[in-house]
Regions:
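Acidic interaction surfaces
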Residues: 2-164
Length: 164
């Protein structure tokens, strides 16, 4: 039994080493951009915000890292610099979202899908991979703003972010 246990533990160690190497090889900014681009194409997105943060103080509780991907309009207004200005005809903005269309709903395809729709489940899985790569690359206290610009190109901007 001891030999089997050691063999199993060695196998686990070997697999963990392989996973670490794969992450080092494939968890890159370029591949993160590819996954974000795939998410935008698959779900016809207009804008998302990716936020990872660790609080400096949590009222005695452990300060644990969290990360989220936001695509609802209310969340984007909170986490995306200037997102709420895209409707203002007098403000210069970079978003493709049309000023002339007050009925425009951001990320409408994804927001209109029922929660149990398989496409939404696939979106959550892809979003989880994006969050994992973002955390691996940027660790914590980051914000990534992604949007389709007026020319129809995907823009990705990362900045430091502190939620305290």
């Amino acid at each position: 039994m001891t030999t089997e246990l050691h063999t199993a533990l060695n196998t686990i160690d070997s697999l963990e080493d392989q996973i670490t190497k794969i992450k080092a090889d494939f968890y890159t900014k370029d591949n993160l951009a590819v996954l974000i681009g795939d998410l935008f194409k698959e779900y016809k997105l207009d804008a998302i915000a990716i936020v990872g943060t660790t609080p400096a103080f949590n009222d005695g509780d452990p300060c644990t890292h969290s990360s989220d991907l936001y695509y609802n309009e209310d969340e984007l207004n909170c986490y995306f610099n200037g997102f709420d200005e895209r409707y203002d005809e007098y403000e210069d903005h970079d978003f493709l979202a049309p000023v002339e269309s007050p009925s425009f709903t951001v990320n409408s395809m994804l927001n209109d899908l029922p929660y149990q729709d398989p496409k939404k489940a696939k979106c959550h899985k892809l979003s989880a991979h994006i969050l994992e790569l973002s955390d691996y690359i940027y660790d914590t206290n980051y914000k990534i703003e992604c949007y389709i610009d007026k020319e129809g190109d995907l823009q990705i901007h990362k900045e430091e972010y502190y939620d305290y």
